[in-house]
């Protein structure tokens, strides 16, 4: 037996064992076969990863039966997405950590353009995939990341208020009764709390300004004992080092003693943009953070200690000092990005930059999940099917990550050595015009 065939056989055995563990998490024995088929189909080459093309690749001589089996398993079967993702995490995370510890928990969301108004969660909203307002649905995720890899461990559809209040559409798409309106930062905080409760080793939380602008999100992370490096908008106000709100007014002996911090016209915080532009040129340092496709990625940064001023006039104690990290590329007329970070006061500028910029790794996940595993290909309209399909995509992706982790950090394992029956030449997907 050749070395390559031996390696392929070992990989097949690992994949089979992994699928067995996922099937166990799906509970019912009759769900094992469609689960294994679905995950295998997601990893096979092919442009579309919706149910019918999967069925055609997996059972080209019995497409109808396979289609019914996969559709029931994904759209109707009441297995737990959380249990399956947890099983995938228990398998994949130790493999990822072979090449280094988890360095970040990454919060993000991704959009799926979708026509019509009947698919669960679809409204006109900002869609990152196309970079503008579009008819789409958006899901929030939490990923655990090492230096080389990351794995989504939580996933939930953002449900706009118009959907939450529409009883008829809720019924038609099977939205669970317990699902109420929650902002994207609130969904992310729920996901983070759950992973903290499961006693997963913690790491600083990374997120963009869509989450960092929410003060309740930042405060929620701190209450959980988690550090963060998260984007904020330039209008955010802060007190620079050495400055702070005025103390409470002196008590005059009547009524309750004043306890709230104060401001006045002469004593106001600065916006991040104002603060950045007030800094001397010597403040800005060149920092490179990783290799790009052609050269090292490099820009100018500065970091200073600040206190966030958000509603501090309702506080009786000074807010804690934290880092403000600012990026100002030399070719730009003003700073382009701002982050708040609760890392220790002795953290070096380079470490702050590298961690803030590590959020890029989730973009690679989404790209591969969408392009290679068909994350956005689910064609059903229901809540359960949308989440089940995403969970299976993530689980299949997890096995790819685990296999890559067996190689050196810079290596790529390539595609799995999976085989599927050849599709008969006479097969035509539903909706294909008949030949004349």
Residue spans for each PLM region:
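A short, flexible helix-boundary coil/loop motif
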Residues: 1-31, 42, 159, 173-180, ...
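Conserved, well-structured functional cores that handle cations and Mg-NTP chemistry
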Residues: 2-206, 210-230, 234-237, 244, ...
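Short, surface-exposed beta-edge/turn micro-motifs
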Residues: 101-102, 139, 321-322, 335-338
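Short amphipathic alpha-helical "interface-anchor" segments enriched in bulky aromatics
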Residues: 107, 111, 211, 258-269, ...
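Short, glycine-/Ser/Thr-/acidic-enriched flexible segments
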Residues: 111-112, 330-331, 344-346
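Catalytic-loop motifs flanking and including active-site residues across diverse enzymes
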Residues: 138, 361, 365, 388-394
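A glycine-rich, aromatic-flanked flexible loop/lid motif
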Residues: 325-341, 358-373
